[in-house]
Amino acid sequence: MGFFSGAADTMGPMPPDENRRSPRILLVTGNPNKLEEARRILGSRLEAVDLDLPEIQSLDLLEVLRAKGWEAYRRVGRPLVVEETGFEIDAFGGFPGPLVKWMLEAMGPEGMARAALAVGEREGSGAGAVARGMVLYVDGERELVGEGVARGTLVVPPRGEGGFGWDPVFLPEGLSGRARTYGELAGAEKDRIGHRGQAWRDLAAK
């Protein structure tokens, strides 16, 4: 996949001359935070397009991703990338997964974390959670999927002003030094261990 050539080995934007030679790829998102994270890894060749796409209600993250990706391609007719994220909470048996957006809208990140911690304490399932990210490239003839997984625990009260979504209540594993939530991490460090950074690098390597 030529437009991602070399991106798997870098955590910063590609050189300007390479950006000029490479075709621009659409990232389907209306979220500027997601575009910023992707550009930190793959460079400015990504440009955002905001489409109002139907979201199928499924606990299968790949099924949701593929439905979204091919519908987006049908509408714009250009090579593009779509992203989906699931948040699997141990105390809820892996729920909400891809439906986390609706739980966050209903409860907020702190409410979600407090509910999970209460159930986990009562049932002995703990405070663990898995952040799972998938990105899909579609060009009309083929699809390529990148996946990233970050294991961690939920914490309250929220910590940190960075990030978005559940970032301030998710304490990822794999950090050196003091434990910090996604919301407390600088961009490059979050990219290194986070589920989205892993997923983008996995896609870039294909």
Question: Where do the PLM segments sit?
Answer:
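Aromatic (phenylalanine/tyrosine) cluster motif
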Residues: 3-4
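Intrinsic disorder/low-complexity segments in short proteins, especially the signal peptide
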Residues: 8-9, 40
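Short, positively charged and aromatic/hydrophobic N-terminal segments
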Residues: 9-10, 18
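Anionic-ligand binding patches
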Residues: 15-26, 33-206
